[in-house]
């Protein structure tokens, strides 16, 4: 299968692999299957980094961050994979998404800081998001670009 071969080659050539996980046992089982398969094909497991998305308090989901880390360990080292980003699930994020307002443009918001840390890890440098140019009142009123 060409798609499978292409995906495998991309993984083998990657400097880093970011595995997005959530606080969900079913998702972690799927992620463990992926990690197990990569290990069996002699993939360099040191390339793997975790991104934990939609973090909620343990009491609301039944599984905490420590359990996520414990469930996903590097078989070569016996230690959890590095976590490069922890992105919380908040009502602000849901509201911004539903209103089609990019929350990431609010530089003081925790979500923006989390995304900035992730981008900095990926590009290997401090990342500063450019602010969009604000439209004039008339442009917003009449919908011009």
Report residues per predicted region:
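Charged/polar, solvent-exposed surface patches and flexible loops
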Residues: 66-74, 95, 117-120, 140
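Conserved catalytic-core segment of NTP-binding enzymes
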Residues: 1-82
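Short amphipathic alpha-helix initiation/capping segments at coil-to-helix junctions
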Residues: 61, 77, 86, 108-111
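Generic hydrophobic/packing signal
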Residues: 27-31, 49, 67, 85, ...
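NTP-binding/hydrolysis catalytic cores, primarily Walker-type P-loop NTPases
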Residues: 98-145
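Beta-strand-loop-alpha "switch" segments that mediate conformational coupling across diverse proteins
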Residues: 55-56, 72-103, 115
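Noncatalytic linker/hinge segments flanking ATPase motor cores
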Residues: 34-42, 58-66, 89-99, 124-133
């Amino acid at each position: 299968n060409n798609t499978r071969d292409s995906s495998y080659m991309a993984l083998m050539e990657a400097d880093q692999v970011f595995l997005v996980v959530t606080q969900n046992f079913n998702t972690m089982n799927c992620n463990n299957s992926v990690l197990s398969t990569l290990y069996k094909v002699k993939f360099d497991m040191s390339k793997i980094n975790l991104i934990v998305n939609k973090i909620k308090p343990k009491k609301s989901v039944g599984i905490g961050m420590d359990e996520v880390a414990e469930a996903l360990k590097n078989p070569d080292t016996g230690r959890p994979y590095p976590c490069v980003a922890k992105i919380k699930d908040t009502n602000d994020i849901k509201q911004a998404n539903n209103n089609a307002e990019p929350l990431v443009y609010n530089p003081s918001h925790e979500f923006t800081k989390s995304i900035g840390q992730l981008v900095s890890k990926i590009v290997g440098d401090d990342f500063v998001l450019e602010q969009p140019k604000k439209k004039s009142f008339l442009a917003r009123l009449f919908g011009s670009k």
